[in-house]
Amino acid sequence: MLESIRVTEKLHWPEHELAKKFVLNAEEALITDSKRSFSSLSSGILKDTFTTGTSSYNVLLQSKEEKKHRSQKRFSSASSKQHRKPSKSPSSSHSKDPSRMTALVPGTGAGTWYCLDGQSAVFVTSSVPSPVKFTRDISITGSGLALPPKPKSKVKRRNLTRLPKPKQQPQLCRSFERGDDISGKKLCILTAIKPINLEKEKLRFFKSDYTYNPQFEYANPTLPGVLAKHSNASDRFLKQSINIMELTLQKYGSYEKFEQATGGSLLSKTRIWSHVRKYMVKEGCLGEIVVHLTEDLLSRASMTVVNGCPTLTINISTAREHWLEGMLRHEIGTHYFRGINNLQQPWNSWIGRKKHELKPNNPTEEGLASIHSVLFRKDPFLWRAALLYYTVYKASHMSFCELFKDIGKFVKDPNTRWDYCVRAKRGWTDTSEPGCFSKDQVYLDGVLQILRFRESIDFHLLTALGKVSYEDVDRLKELAVTENMRVPHFLHDHSRYMEHLERIMEVNELTDAELKNLI
């Protein structure tokens, strides 16, 4: 990977929306599960996770829209009187009998599940601004969670608590390359290069019958130096990328047929949550991550940190039945676990990385995650990594229109082609000129490097040591903190894991001789 980029996907992040989400029944909800230990997480992470909207529910719970409006009116009335006893929360009638709690699923609109161990889950939407005013009565000390005593009132009522604004947790965040805007604030490069007029230009492009080159605008376009470092595409693995896509098309006829045959049907929000919850239980991380569903994401998913809280965003328009767990292995089993493990290491800061002379964690990070995406598929074609690599290379020599037409030989659907072209041309204003944002070549680059050295890589340590390159593992293992490290379930059986790596080599017709010659 390019030295300055260390992030998966962060093309769009609605931080202003997430900041407005509230937790119902915070007093009752924030209870730690005696069966679960968060010893592997620092107190800072716990504090940020518990105070940014993650309630202690684990099963989806949402009131109907009309009930929600009535509830908000009731809460607003109650909260305006400071010395008055709090009114009942909408769920108080059910809280008397835990067995009566039912899992209601979200209807329409985007929202967020907030989860902690041991109890049911709450789904909070932000479509209507909340008038609720909370009091501060939650405190966190050390690595444990301290709660205020219950109100002594004999009447069983529930308090609504305002969660204090969290401190940013830079250690947990992926290392983003940043630039400064005019106000001096730091900018994530992937956020800065997302066009603000994307929908408008898409409409104009489609109306022109694909002959108009979009003119993108940016909220913070002052990154010429940073963009210049990522405008050089490589052709090192171009032959392999083309071969992988051609093999896929030979077997399935078209990408669309490949997608349907191997990915399965698109999932509803209910089924997405069911799969996510099941996977989190399997990995022992239920309650540690906020899950957000959206349709406004160029990638399939992203694992980021919002206000110090690990947040998984899933693009529901691409969430397919047989591919979703692969995405979870990519985002949680790879990025999240390596990020958590990194916190305990001496190189968990920029100073530490410089002191120990660490190589960039990419392309290892994204290569490993991309392998895990296809690990258990029947036909683990590296299609997406190959198409991203190819598209970036072609973008460096073509205009937007030319690129759109060129990748039509691999992908027919115009909306899918648009997404790939935008990813390759992001950061550019006039897309009639040749030019690319080369970050997306890191996936195939990383995959092929890891496959090249798969026999010598200790994959267990590669995860346990945190955000490190496979090239640094041997020299860092003596310095590493290995107690309480988090390793995903699919790495527990080493022989099975290696068998699947061999399967990936076979299906994509990659040979050791070829990789040794290239790398």
Swiss-Prot record:
PANTHER family: PTHR31817, TYROSINE CARBOXYPEPTIDASE MATCAP2-RELATED. Putative tyrosine carboxypeptidase. The keyword Hydrolase applies. SMART domains: DUF1704. The gene is Matcap2. This is Putative tyrosine carboxypeptidase MATCAP2. Putative metalloprotease with an atypical HExxxH zinc-binding motif instead of HExxH, which interrupts the active site-containing helix without affecting the integrity of the catalytic site arrangement. It comes from Mus musculus (Mouse). The active site is at E331. Keywords: Carboxypeptidase, Hydrolase, Metal-binding, Metalloprotease, Protease, Zinc. Its cofactor is Zn(2+). InterPro entries: MATCAP. The keyword Hydrolase applies. Zn(2+) binds at H330, H335, E366. One of its GO terms (biological process) is proteolysis. Residues 63-103 are annotated as: Disordered.
